[in-house]
Each structure stands twice: as structure tokens, then as C-alpha cells.
Amino acid sequence: MYAIVKAGGHQEKVEVGDVILVNRLNAKKGDTVEFPAALVVDGSKVILGAKDLAKLTVKAEVVNDEAKGPKISIMKYKNKTGVARRKGHRQQLTLVKITAIA
């Protein structure tokens, strides 16, 4: 059984026991969070209707609330003028473990 969930502005394919990184959530380590399901597949049975999906949620436990993504360097450069600008960014993420699809 797996599900496609909406988590942090993205969609992720998850099964029970999976550990995924999502954009920063407002939750502490050990908290339980719920994600709405966009699609659930159970063997040959596919649940796709809005009424059926409203009854289903995917529960997850926060494993790490202080994870960070890779450092991304941005360089802006103007030719022949000596103008150069560097900037960096690291996305703040939350690590969650899927505990139930119900």
C-alpha cells in the first residue's frame, strides 16, 4: 500500500516506514503530523475520488525538525564592469517518518 501525499508544497510517494524530507513544518521533534492524501493505491484498488480521500490521512512522526538542504551558491555577474555578487541559500527542512496510512 502506498500513497501520494501533499507535504510542504510538494507531492511525495510514501509507504509506511518511509523517511522523507519536506519543507520546514511548524512541529517539534517527536510530534505527530498529518498529510492529506492525493491518491492511495492498495494492491489493485486505487482510491482517487475526493469524497473517499477526505476520509484518509497519512500520519507521520517528526524525526528531525532542524534539517537543512544542500548549500546553493548564486553568482550574479556583469561583464566588463567589475560587478559581481555572490549569494548562498540553504533550505530549512523537516525529516518525517510515515507511521500510518488510514
UniProtKB/Swiss-Prot annotation:
Pfam families tied to this protein: Ribosomal_L21p (PF00829)
One annotated Gene Ontology cellular component of this protein: cytoplasm
Alphabetical keyword list: Ribonucleoprotein, Ribosomal protein, RNA-binding, rRNA-binding
Segments traversing the membrane: none
An example Gene Ontology biological process: translation
Cited InterPro entries: bL21-like, bL21-like_sf, Ribosomal_bL21, Ribosomal_bL21_CS
GO molecular function list: rRNA binding; structural constituent of ribosome
SUPFAM superfamilies in the cross-refs: L21p-like
Record family assignment: Belongs to the bacterial ribosomal protein bL21 family.
Protein name listed in UniProt: Large ribosomal subunit protein bL21
